[in-house]
């Protein structure tokens, strides 16, 4: 059986099952909880019966996936809990482990966040380097507007109120407030409210995410829920 050795949010049950069944299709895997459940210390996650050799072969890979995904879901839930009572929604980012993006981003959803882009094809964000290469926010938005289907929204990353106003005037439907102070974010919300969606990003921590949400932004994105999460402490124990 696999047990939690500390309180955590469960994520990755289907991945764990797939690992065991890939190693040996005759293994019987029984989950004792559901993704998203909060487990107590020493609570059982799943039970596996069958060949001891097969179970041991799959043990480390299974625990690696589960530990990583449970850790992400657990930290994400802590962030989401801080947003209770505000309208802000938590978003993940593309700062993921190479090869594991789908699994890591699925774990943030289990924890209560929403997925931002999986890749560049999922949406358009005009960032600092794009703006410099194009020669300015307005021209960057205009060029994209000419080539994009009308169903795709354009988001622009800005670092101050002047840039936020320019992005709005250029036609951006989403504006990312990057590394702006709480006071600047509050001013941006008052100025832009209802005319574009606002996303706060940069230096978001568990300690300040509530304050960021209270500025009135629509979304808060942070890579920390993935890249700074700690693996959940899990263990596989044999019973004969």
Identify the function of each model-found stretch.
Residues 1-170, 174, 186-191, 195-199, ...:
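Acidic/glycine-rich phosphate/pyrophosphate-binding loops and surrounding catalytic core
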Residues 177-178, 198-204, 222-224:
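Glycine-rich beta-strand-to-loop/alpha-helix junction loops that act as flexible
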Residues 224-240:
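Short, charged, intrinsically disordered terminal tails
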């Amino acid at each position: 059986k696999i047990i939690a050795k500390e309180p955590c949010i469960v994520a990755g049950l289907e991945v764990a099952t797939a690992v065991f069944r890939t190693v040996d299709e005759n293994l019987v895997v029984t989950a004792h909880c559901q993704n998203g459940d909060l487990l107590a210390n020493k609570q059982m996650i799943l039970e596996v019966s069958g060949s001891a050799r097969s179970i041991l072969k799959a043990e480390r890979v299974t625990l690696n996936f589960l530990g990583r995904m449970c850790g992400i879901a657990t930290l994400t839930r802590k962030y989401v809990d801080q947003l209770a009572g505000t309208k802000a929604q938590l978003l993940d980012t593309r700062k993921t482990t190479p090869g594991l993006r789908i699994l890591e981003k699925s774990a943030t959803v289990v924890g209560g966040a929403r997925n931002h882009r999986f890749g560049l094809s999922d949406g358009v964000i005009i960032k600092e380097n794009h703006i410099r290469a194009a020669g300015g926010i307005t021209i960057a938005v205009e060029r994209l507007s000419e080539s994009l289907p009308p169903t795709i929204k354009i988001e622009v990353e800005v670092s101050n109120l002047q840039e936020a106003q320019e992005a709005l005037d250029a036609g951006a439907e989403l504006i990312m407030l990057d590394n702006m102070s709480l006071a600047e974010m509050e001013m941006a919300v008052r100025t832009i409210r209802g005319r574009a969606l606002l996303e706060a990003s940069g230096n978001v921590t568990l300690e300040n995410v509530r304050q960021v949400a209270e500025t009135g932004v629509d979304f808060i994105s942070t890579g920390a829920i993935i890249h700074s999460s700690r693996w959940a402490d899990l263990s596989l124990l044999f019973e004969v």
